[in-house]
Amino acid sequence: MKPVKSTAEILAFKVLNRDINKTWVDWAVEMLMAGFDTENLAILAGEFEPYNQFQLQDLTTKVLSELQLDLTDKDQTIKNYACFLIDKSLVGELDNFKVLDILKDICIELDYEKYLYDFYSLYFAKDDLSYSENQWYWDGATRENIEKIITDYFTNWKSNCLTN
């Protein structure tokens, strides 16, 4: 059995030490519906607000351990999350600017991690072009071609996801 697609997001949240929220609970429900069944996963699926972060951080660690989900390679976990977000963008479920915003923030959080820096640059190129004719982040990007540049970059990134 393969974990549900949103597992990439949950693992990224864990390695980035994000607060537990409804996204985690929804993921736990999805996992149960997909046939995964552990005691702690069922407990997580039954949680509701307000969330006790101390208790839930411990619970989610147990859930991920029970499901044998690997968190040892932080960079690969983040790359998998980028693949998840890009996939959602390419099928129209998530706006590409929102994807760039999320990955730009992670890039900053991770001290301008090299493998995320293009997302940072594309975010600010598109942002600048939303109110100006000029941008200095992505060579050759204009208002006329920024969407294609982003889509091509996402498509290329996704093709690399499939080889990992």
Regions found by a protein language model. Name each.
Residues 1-164:
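Acidic, Ser/Pro/Thr-rich low-complexity regulatory regions
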